[in-house]
Amino acid sequence: MKLYSRILGKGQPLLIIHGLFGMSDNWQSLAKLYADYFEVHIIDQRNHGRSPHADEFSYIHLSNDLHQYILENHLNDVIIIGHSLGGKTAMQFAVSYPELLSKLIIVDISPRFYPIHHDKIIEGLKILDFSNLKSRSQADTVLSDYIEEYDVRQFLLKSMYWKEKGQLDFRFNLKSISKNISNVGAALNDEANCSIPTLFVKGGNSNYVNDDDEDLIFKHFTNAEIQTVEQAGHWLHAEKPEEFFKKTIRFCLSY
């Protein structure tokens, strides 16, 4: 599968992989900062953004898509930053193709299994009738009955676009994502391990990575460190971009 990407800057390749229901647009501001030091590739994963849609959606597929992208673009000594779903993709890639990697940054996700917790979001998204919706504000009103958090709704609505004149739609493939949602929480294979220098960055207010995850992180990633962005939740890179950038660029530039 040929993935869509935006490429900024020159130098060692740094790939950024978004989370579930996200897209490359979400990372543009930070990508411009990284581009002062690296050749930054902001990638749309399959079933997201401007990348192709497919029925298959698992971390093996997402990792293999990334592998194909790296080979097609003749990249090596790669640094990967992956958030949430993108972090899981990055972990799977790291244990499958370590020879292509230089460093790894995993943002607010651990290698463990996560129970399905997107039910209300998917229910709300499925209820949207695009034949009658004429604006994002109308969609937001409908979604508010299912998703209380305003910032979550606005994040989802960023993927809404004019498919054709008078016809709104989402860029993500809701049908495939909802069908395969059980794969999203999958754990890394118990035997998988990676010695690549790895930074796990978690939000201090997030419950995605907790103290109990640390042993598992160090089991799979033997050269890992864990840092916290305080007063930040799951979208720590959006909530505290300056602190997030400082922590990650320091790691990227270290030897």
Tell what function each PLM region has.
Residues 44-49, 110, 232-233:
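Short beta-to-alpha linker loops that shape the active-site pocket of alpha/beta-hydrolase fold enzymes
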Residues 165-220, 225-228:
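Conserved serine/cysteine hydrolase catalytic core
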Residues 1-15, 35-38, 73-76, 221-225, ...:
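Alpha/beta-hydrolase fold catalytic core
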Residues 224-255:
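Catalytic active-site module of serine/aspartate enzymes centered on a nucleophile-bearing elbow/loop
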Residues 92-95, 102-134:
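Flexible "cap/lid" loop of the alpha/beta hydrolase fold
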Residues 32, 41-81, 85, 246:
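Active-site loop/oxyanion-hole signature of alpha/beta-hydrolase fold enzymes
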Residues 6-52:
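Conserved HGGG/HGGXW glycine-rich cap/lid loop of the alpha/beta-hydrolase fold
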Residues 116, 131-188:
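Conserved alpha/beta-hydrolase catalytic His-Asp/Glu region
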